[in-house]
């Protein structure tokens, strides 16, 4: 039977000093010997997805104490990608993921905590905590802050749904009046919660369900709805049960590496493809697999992208549906139910409830269950009232959306497309692969050929688009924005947004070794690996070179002979220390970012640290 980790600091006469300090935090004699459970919160007033989390830690802590554990809360940082977007702040977003993972490891190992409840929500916080969970491999449950309600406003006598991306597009569209732009801005983000479409935050919180690390409804129940409180309370109670199963019953199925195993990663990727999740999820799942020491690659993802259909289409891929609509249609579990009936899932994997995925589908899929409480749970809907308070309303839809022919979630026979919403491409310009969100690509753009228009920074690309230098038919190439080259692998939401604002959304393709926001749609291909700064072919592309993109065949080709590429490579190498660096970019880089860049791998490895290099440095 495993010994409680916390016994290191709570047992024995030689730990009198540590116990004295524990007593100063409120612990008493009866607490020593109970499991100490870390409540890992991420409250901040900078981020709407986290602004309502201040009291959530103590809500969970109360449930832990009531169930027989000792709860100790601490906080991580949280970066808002939307606010950091379009300026140097975005350089810090992806590195913050790894900083969060490290900070959780530091706190949990320094204080010998026995288990964790991770209260996350937005883009880099959920994956950062997930990486830490896999690294530490102690019992854990994820519970997120929940999605924002979709915005609504009246334009041209019509009520339309809105989200953050609409505000960005219309704000840069010269044909939109100041009055309408202001209306959209004021209505796009009406409540606390993660932005209302299938962007990165909501994608990751949905994947936490599919991995078995979060409770049913975690990815889709609105932040404002009263029913979400039960997820926090249940997480606090259930983590004590998980902890007992491991430490008292020696049940290793309670550990995250045995829950989020390779088969669970398969299920999560199937969900991701079926719901057209953010391309960032590929980066984060690869990083999670690395931390769990699971051999899971972009090749595995590519195989699934060819056989998994798209069963759910949500903003930004369509204006019709947002996360509140996904929840009404049965949420993540109902999508998994359709995938299971299509024979695509591994349903015998365990979860934090102590059951299997098959059990969860049988109980929570709204097309299968007769449980009226579960049906009521999925009828939880928006109130349409501006607020930053959690659990502030209890509105419900009159009916569920169980229409699997024309609804938000479809069955296999009525899929939005037979191939899913994400695809991995490869070719001489991306030898180790690149990623596109096919859910947001129109059918007439699945094959595209055009001349390269080169930019060596996102800033230059934005200026080029807005100044009219980019024309229809071009492939906009933004390079040296990868994990190492940025550094930090910026999101390219502004270039894609401004292409749409200038009427070029379907007339141009965009290719980058950077990444894209979950709010991106259109022919936007990111994560080109190897990146330019790591000797990738994308660094050798010259102005006017023809690039051919073929999503159905999963190919992307720079139409330049191998002989010419070798000549260009030799010329690049001859530059010595200036090789594989942008020619004219002026960008101050802090020591914190230099530290990240020194060890960063390309996107096909999840942009995690280069472990081989790190081991070599330490061994020296």
Swiss-Prot record:
GO cellular component terms attached to this protein's record: cytosol
Pathway terms, separated by semicolons: Amino-acid biosynthesis; L-isoleucine biosynthesis; L-isoleucine from 2-oxobutanoate: step 3/4; Amino-acid biosynthesis; L-valine biosynthesis; L-valine from pyruvate: step 3/4
Protein's name in the database: Dihydroxy-acid dehydratase
Subunit comment: Homodimer.
Co-factor binding comment: Binds 1 [2Fe-2S] cluster per subunit. This cluster acts as a Lewis acid cofactor.
Pfam (any one): ILVD_EDD_N
Sequence positions that bind [2Fe-2S] cluster: 122, 195
InterPro entries in alphabetical order: Dihydro-acid_dehy_C, DihydroxyA_deHydtase, DiOHA_6PGluconate_deHydtase_CS, ILV_EDD_C, ILV_EDD_N, IlvD/EDD_N
